[in-house]
Regions:
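Accessory interaction regions appended to the cores of large information-processing enzymes
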Residues: 1-194
Length: 194
């Protein structure tokens, strides 16, 4: 599992042009660590710039792997249509399932979408899903990400006839088998285990 330790912001523009209708979506968002009952500040400051937050809608999403994602729509003035918000959320969720730091599940994050841009013809759900996913990934990496459980590099020497049992046990503990070899009459398993 992974999470973040401080607030960060990111902007991402997804733009693809090919012959006919293209793809365009731009998302500006803020990520921050989340805990139960945490208030939403009225303003955030990053690099001397101030960002005013006007909460339009909040979704609290309990995650299957534990923790929560709190998604806040703070778009003012229609810079992104409300119909694209579910696509942005879907992009963020897909990145939380494969956290930006190690590929482990991310948890306990609040995301505030505060601005963006759309195109009357080229904007669609896919564009905003990708823009949301990539903006989240960029912001997450700048928000002091940390691993919530240690992952150990493990070498196990085991008799050949017990190899299957040991592999099953390691995988049952969410271990990832990285390699196998034979050494002095034993099988050697190399794995990463939480």
């Amino acid at each position: 599992r992974e999470t973040i330790t401080k607030a960060a912001r990111a902007d991402y523009r997804h733009k693809k042009q090919s012959g006919g209708a293209g793809q365009f979506g731009e998302v500006h968002l803020i990520v921050e660590p989340y805990y139960e009952g945490m208030p939403v500040p009225e303003t955030y400051k990053f690099n001397g710039q101030e960002f005013k937050i006007n909460v339009k809608g909040t979704e609290e999403i309990p995650l299957e792997w534990g923790g929560k994602l709190v998604f806040i729509n703070s778009i003012v003035g229609g810079s992104i249509d409300a119909r694209f918000m579910p696509a942005i959320l879907k992009g963020i969720m897909s990145r939380m399932e494969q956290g930006p730091l190690t590929g482990s599940y991310a948890r306990d994050v609040r995301v505030i979408v505060y601005d963006g841009k759309m195109h009357p013809v080229d904007s669609n759900e896919i564009s905003f899903m990708l823009a949301g996913r990539n903006a989240f990934s960029e912001a997450f990496k700048n928000a002091g990400p940390k691993i919530l459980e240690p992952i150990y590099d493990v070498e196990v020497f085991v008799p050949s006839d017990k190899m299957g049992d040991v592999m099953s046990d390691l995988q049952g503990r969410r271990g990832m088998i990285m390699g196998m070899s034979s050494e002095s009459g034993y099988e050697k398993l190399v794995a990463k285990v939480p």
